[in-house]
């Protein structure tokens, strides 16, 4: 399965599809509400 490259916005339904981790502004621990509003992006493995 293809993974989503860094800088791709990741949401709660697809955050596991990042090649690395789904990183939110407040740190690598993804907060569900931040994912819902599109504040998180794929980035390096946390």
Curated annotation (Swiss-Prot):
Tissue expression from the record: Expressed by the venom gland.
The secretion signal range is none
User: In this UniProt entry, which cysteines form S-S bonds?
Assistant: 3-19, 10-22, 18-42, 24-40
Q: Name one GO cellular component term.
A: extracellular region
Region of interest (Keys region for toxin activity), residue spans = 31-33
Question: Where's it found, cell-wise?
Answer: Secreted
The record's section on InterPro entries has:
Insecticidal_knottin-like_sf, Toxin_28
Q: Which protein family is named in the record?
A: Belongs to the neurotoxin 16 (SFI) family.
Read off the domain note: The presence of a 'disulfide through disulfide knot' structurally defines this protein as a knottin.
Chain's role = Insecticidal toxin. It inhibits insect voltage-gated sodium channels (Nav) by partially blocking the channel pore in DUM neurons from the American cockroach, not by acting as a gating modifier. The inhibition is only partially reversible after prolonged washout. In vivo, the toxin causes flaccid paralysis followed by death when injected into Heliothis virescens larvae. It also causes uncoordinated movements followed by full paralysis to sheep blowflies (Lucilia cuprina).
Q: What is the name listed in the Swiss-Prot or TrEMBL entry for this protein?
A: Mu-segestritoxin-Sf1f
Query: Which species?
Result: Segestria florentina
The taxonomic lineage of its organism, from the top, reads: Eukaryota, Metazoa, Ecdysozoa, Arthropoda, Chelicerata
């Amino acid at each position: 399965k293809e993974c989503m490259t860094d800088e791709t916005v990741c949401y709660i339904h697809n955050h596991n599809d990042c090649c690395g981790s789904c990183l939110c502004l407040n740190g690598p621990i993804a907060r569900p509400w931040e994912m819902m509003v599109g504040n998180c992006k794929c980035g390096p493995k946390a």
